């Protein structure tokens, strides 16, 4: 599978205030995947920006960094209300997966033990890979792995995870340099 980049209109885990303007200036780039977080913009503005992305033929992603079930459900409902194609993030809950499936939305939950703000990823590579396999058995078809937030070796984790898991994989977590972007294409 050819790697793709998702342009996230965020800074320090918050959607930038001028996300709509930035997208309008960049919408003709040959980048298919665009998104932002559920924090930083009011919901009506999120809906407007997501709509502009879709009108330009882009696939849209909302990333939600929450850990309790109620907050994860709220983030899922926001993604649905705003018309996103994918919800990325949230700790996996059956209720979130069910809501998204009922509304025809793709779901890339976090994998491994994610906590804190900014988020960190804990667990051995083997535990994280097994967590993904367990979620795939429940019907999950892709993951948001915060490799560069891993407490040990994010690059090694990303390589091992991609080799072991046959699913859509979004490697995330501070991919904020050309060197890290190049590494993603190498993996």
PLM regions with names:
Residues 1-4, 56, 102-105, 165-167, ...:
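Short coil/turn connectors at secondary-structure junctions
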Residues 1-61, 66-70, 76-82, 136-137:
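Conserved N-terminal beta1-alpha1 strand-loop-helix module at the mouth
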Residues 3-10, 32-36, 60-64, 87-89, ...:
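Hydrophobic faces of well-ordered beta-strands that scaffold small-molecule active sites
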Residues 19, 46, 72, 128, ...:
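Aromatic/hydrophobic pocket-lining residues that form the small-molecule binding cavity
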Residues 23, 50, 76, 97, ...:
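Generic hydrophobic/aromatic pocket-lining and core-packing "Φ" positions
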Residues 57, 65, 69-150, 164:
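Conserved anion-binding
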Residues 147-159, 163, 182-186:
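Contiguous, function-dense segments enriched for cysteine-driven chemistry
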Residues 166-187:
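C-terminal alpha-helical cap/extension of soluble enzyme domains
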């Amino acid at each position: 599978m050819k790697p793709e980049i998702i342009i996230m209109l965020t800074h320090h885990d918050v959607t930038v205030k001028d996300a709509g303007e930035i997208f309008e200036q960049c919408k003709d780039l040959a980048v298919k995947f665009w998104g932002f977080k559920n924090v930083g913009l009011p919901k009506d503005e999120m809906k407007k920006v997501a709509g502009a992305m879709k009108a330009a033929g882009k696939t849209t992603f909302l990333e939600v960094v929450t850990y309790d079930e109620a907050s994860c459900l709220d983030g899922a409902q926001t993604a649905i209300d705003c018309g996103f194609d994918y919800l990325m993030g949230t700790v996996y809950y059956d209720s979130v997966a069910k809501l998204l499936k009922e509304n025809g939305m793709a779901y890339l939950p976090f994998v491994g033990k994610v906590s804190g703000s900014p988020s960190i990823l804990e667990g051995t590579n083997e535990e994280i890979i097994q967590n993904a396999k367990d979620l795939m058995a429940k019907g999950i078809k892709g993951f948001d792995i915060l490799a560069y937030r891993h407490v040990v070796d994010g690059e090694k984790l990303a390589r091992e995870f991609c080799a072991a898991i046959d699913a859509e994989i979004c490697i995330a977590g501070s991919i904020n340099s050309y060197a890290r972007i190049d590494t993603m294409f190498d993996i």
